[in-house]
Amino acid sequence: MRPGFSVPGESGRERPAFPLPCACGTLRPMPPPAKKPAQKKKPLPLLPDFRFEIEEGAPARLVCGVDEAGRGPLAGPVVAAAVIIDLTRCPEGLNDSKKLDAARRADLLAELADCAEIGVGIASVEEIDEINILHATMLAMTRAVASLPRAPHIALIDGNRCPPSLACASRAVIGGDALARSIAAASIVAKVTRDRMMAALAETHPGYGFEKHMGYSTPEHFDALSRLGPCAIHRRSFAPVRKMLSPGLEEGLDLVSGESVNLLIQKAY
């Protein structure tokens, strides 16, 4: 081994120094294995705040949050709520209604009734079947905003589209019920209101379990449909219900009217 290309090794042996020339190039020591970057811990989920409301000028301008409950069920109306919150008197723990249990939603609704302006809008089963669930939802939202004690300057709408016939400006907020407090409040109002309406409808349409599943597609609901057939508050335009209707029964259904819905709203509260 040529001088200058070896270093003392263990037991007096010599080992080659690096780099060494070879037929395929220069040999270099293997770099140490790269350390994996430490994985960042996922931040804890945050509660909705007033960021969107403040961006739209609150509290100087009236900003309402709007959300709905009941787009997916096979039975019952779709309910929307619009809420204007006093930024200085906001109940603690406001969140997307789906993340709260029924008792907590009821408590928050009671608090909101004392410190917020609330409007509720309904689209009946008949309207859902006539204009489809999407347009019925937009109609319910429009009615909710129109029923507020004061007309807002702008409405923050949960989702990716806004009702076209609102009397004020609007802004769609995807996932808004988990981001904006006024939308979270609206989701709670809409959910509790509709649940109470479905419990009242369960009394006049027994056997379906509406007070438990609120008209959603559950095994219990499908079992009742197969035994009893659709009733007056089932949505004929929804495929699972439509498949169970005979032509004669479809013509004879006595659907829930807007006037009946207003009575149910009063009973819900």
Curated annotation (Swiss-Prot):
Gene Ontology terms describing biological process: DNA replication, removal of RNA primer; mismatch repair
UniProt cofactor(s): Mn(2+); Mg(2+)
GO molecular function: manganese ion binding; RNA binding; RNA-DNA hybrid ribonuclease activity
Alphabetized SUPFAM superfamilies for the sequence: Ribonuclease H-like
Catalytic activity: Endonucleolytic cleavage to 5'-phosphomonoester
Major subcellular location class: cytoplasm
Record key words, sorted: Cytoplasm, Endonuclease, Hydrolase, Manganese, Metal-binding, Nuclease
Top EC class for this record: hydrolase
Chain sites annotated for binding a divalent metal cation: 67-68, 158
Residues annotated as domain RNase H type-2: 61-250
Disulphide connectivity of cysteines: none
Record's function text: Endonuclease that specifically degrades the RNA of RNA-DNA hybrids.
Homology family: Belongs to the RNase HII family.
Protein name per the record: Ribonuclease HII
Lineage: Bacteria, Pseudomonadati, Pseudomonadota, Alphaproteobacteria, Hyphomicrobiales
Gene name of this polypeptide: rnhB
